[in-house]
Swiss-Prot record:
Region feature (Disordered): 276-310
Subunit: Heterodimer with TRM732; for 2'-O-methylation of cytidine 32 in substrate tRNAs. Heterodimer with RTT10/TRM734; for 2'-O-methylation of position 34 in substrate tRNAs.
Organism listed in the record: Saccharomyces cerevisiae (strain ATCC 204508 / S288c)
Sites where the protein binds S-adenosyl-L-methionine: 25, 55-57, 83, 99, 124
Effect of residue 26 to E/P: Severely decreases methylation of guanosine in tRNA(Phe). Decreases cell population growth
Region (Interacts with RTT10/TRM734): 129-254
Function: Methylates the 2'-O-ribose of nucleotides at positions 32 and 34 of the tRNA anticodon loop of substrate tRNAs. Requisite for faithful cytoplasmic translation. Requires TRM732 for methylation of the cytidine at position 32 of the anticodon loop of substrate tRNAs. Requires RTT10/TRM734 for methylation of the nucleotide at position 34 of the anticodon loop of substrate tRNAs. May modify position 32 in tRNA(Leu(UAA)), tRNA(Phe(GAA)), and tRNA(Trp(CCA)) and position 34 in tRNA(Leu(UAA)), tRNA(Phe(GAA)) and tRNA(Trp(CCA)).
Disruption phenotype: Leads to abnormal 2'-O-methylation and decreases charging of tRNA(Phe(GAA)) and tRNA(Leu(UAA)), resulting in translational defects and GCN2-dependent activation of the general amino acid control (GAAC) response. Increases cellular ROS (reactive oxygen species) levels. Sensitive to oxidative stress induced by hydrogen peroxide, rotenone, and acetic acid. Increases RNA level of TRM7, TRM13 and TRM44. Decreases cell population growth; the effect is suppressed by knockout of GCN2, GCN4 or MAF1.
Active site (UniProt): 164
Name of the protein described by the UniProt record: tRNA (cytidine(32)/guanosine(34)-2'-O)-methyltransferase
Compositional bias annotation for Polar residues: 276-289
């Protein structure tokens, strides 16, 4: 997060820096937790954050499980964050620079947990959006299915899975698929998520896979093959309409999260509210990007060697 006039245009952006979070997305998880309280469970011990970079959700998890928890027994608690991009260290968090679709990543997570299953898995990952909503929604659902495959292998029965989604035309397909694995599916929209965005979060409560299904992560296995035997692979969009039963579509409960007194994520605040820190100057970023794709371009620009096409 950089220094700019965005501090005034987006108060969640500013508040994140004031409170030491690396990104404004931290407030999305906090507001989801205010509604569902999945991080307030005293028995929550093993947590996985997928697609975690730059690490704001991992920061929330660290503070909830270690800094703010009233429990004195915190030795057994573990947080593992996974991302293809490198992440700067976070207290109480083990970071893995790894691919969530690879079996070796699964093995590394289970080893860190002592071969115990996770209580909670979350994913705030999203692809680089193109502006083509149908394409963005499709790619995002593929990312969710990849996260779900890993989650199915590491989440304990009764556990919770939270992931970012893009609400589009066929999102009820995803609701139906997740309904085969979880007792309750809720689509939640935090106040800190811009109302103009298709972004929302799927909250899956009570992991309850079929008793005769054993998930196995394999790089050579397709999504359909992975979910073979748990009925989820029955639901797919086919060009042949006769293969699709409209009655199988589910409508998930929709819930807005966050207090009505919260800031409007779509509003521009020219005068900072009194609840925001007194200074109106721009704040330094909490954590600079570790290896941004634009790093070389910045170096060339600062040295005056960046050429412009005519």
């Amino acid at each position: 997060m950089g220094k700019s006039s965005k501090d005034k245009r987006d108060l969640y952006y500013r508040k994140a820096k004031e409170q030491g979070y690396r990104a404004r997305s931290a407030f999305k998880l906090l507001q989801l937790n205010d509604q569902f309280h999945f991080l307030d469970d005293p028995n929550l011990k093993r947590v996985v954050d997928l697609c975690a970079a730059p690490g704001s959700w991992s920061q929330v998890l660290s503070r909830k499980l270690f800094d703010e928890s009233p429990s004195s027994d915190k030795e057994d608690r573990k947080i593992v964050s996974v991302d293809l991009q490198p992440m700067s260290p976070i207290p109480h968090v083990t970071t893995l620079q790894a691919d969530i679709t690879h079996p070796k990543t699964l093995a590394r997570i289970l080893k860190l947990f002592g071969n115990e299953k996770a209580d909670f898995v979350c994913s705030d990952g999203a692809p680089d959006v193109t502006g083509l909503h149908d394409l963005d929604e499709y790619v995002q659902q593929q990312l969710i299915m990849s996260a779900l495959q890993l989650t199915a292998c590491i989440l304990k029965k009764g556990g919770t899975f939270v992931a970012k989604i893009f609400r589009g035309r066929d999102i009820d397909m995803l609701y139906s698929q997740l309904g085969y694995l979880f007792d309750k599916i809720v689509c939640a929209k935090p106040r800190s998520s811009r109302g103009t965005s298709l972004e929302a979060f799927i909250v899956c409560l009570g992991y309850n896979p079929p008793s005769n299904w054993t998930p196995k992560l394999d790089v050579n296995t397709s999504v359909d093959e992975f979910f073979q035997g748990c009925f989820l692979n029955k639901l797919c969009i086919s060009d042949k309409l006769s293969h699709w039963n409209e009655e199988e579509r589910n409508i998930a409960e929709f819930m807005a999260c966050g207090s009505l007194q919260s800031f409007d994520s779509d509003a521009t605040y020219h005068d900072l509210p009194s609840s925001v820190a007194g200074t109106s100057s721009s704040l330094d970023p909490v954590q600079s990007p570790t290896n941004p794709p634009y790093k070389k371009a910045l170096e060339l620009k600062r040295s005056g060697k960046l050429t412009r096409s005519v």
